Amino acid sequence: MMSRSSSSKGLVRDGVRRSLWAVVLSTLAFVVSMLLPSLMNMQQALENRKGMIVDGARASELAQSWKSSLADAAIYIGGENALVKLAVILLAVVAGTAMFAYLHDKRKVDFYHSLPVSREKLYLVNFVTGAVCVIAPYLVLRVLTLVCAHAMGFGEAVSVGTYLGVILCDILFFLLMYAMSALSTILCGNTIIALLLQLWVYLAPLAIQMMHEGLLSLYCKTYDSISYSDLFNHLRLSPAATYFMVNGANYGSGLADNFIRAGKPAYMLLAEYAAAALFIIAL
């Protein structure tokens, strides 16, 4: 019979306990990027509304101002909050690197591989541990932010369906970039090299496309700049860049006037990234 300490649940529980710093870091990151900006925005909107009432604003003006306040709140609460996306990307890099950095230390490798646990199971435990350390605080802060929004009267800003789409999108992109970070760390024999490889993997498609556009614009006088939709197609290999172009389960509505996908469902894109995440994790 497998002992409790060597069971999958026991190993994950012990891993999370040893990685409390990651839980604290994730909680702090989402408080600063998600909860605080939302509270500050909603509080400012309420103060502005109170000032308009004191000044004797007409009902139509109050309604228009409130509609604008709800739209602004939706940005911070929903899927167009760039601070949350940045936090997700950074935490994916930190978790992916930290959970597998032991492979770069011979003494730690000897210790972990001497445990009565297969290497496949050890990989799965480390991967799940890192995911739990980030996703659990994320979900808690998402729920807390939504509760605060309803308590302050901004429940109409984002529907429940849209909010669930935002949560699923954030988790999907986190798992994809977390898997890419973990794979880079496993393949490299040095943590610094692993971080540089991750930087290249995340940003190389964007950098290459920018250089391509810049050189053509500089040396080809008849060159017509690429459209936003074509640029998006070229950036599909860069999940970090694409992440900022989606709003939950839809493409971002405020990206650009000539972006034909703006506001439309992004189910196919998310399915492609989900398949990519599963493939990388299975490696």
Range-by-range predicted roles:
Residues M1-V24:
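Aromatic- and glycine-rich beta-strand/loop motifs that create alpha-glucan
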Residues R4-S5, M40-G78, L203-L283:
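Terminal transmembrane helical anchor/hairpin motif
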Residues R17-G56, A82-V94, Q198-Q209:
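Hydrophobic alpha-helical transmembrane segments of multi-pass membrane transport/permease proteins
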Residues Q44, A101-D105, V109, I192, ...:
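Juxtamembrane/interface segments at transmembrane-helix termini
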Residues A71-N81, T129-A194, Q198, L206-K221:
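Secretory targeting signals
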Residues G79-K108, F127:
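Long, hydrophobic alpha-helical segments
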Residues A92-V94, L172-A179, E272-A282:
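Hydrophobic cores of alpha-helical transmembrane segments in multi-pass inner/ER membrane proteins
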Residues F100-V132:
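Helix-loop-helix units of permease transmembrane domains in multi-pass membrane transporters
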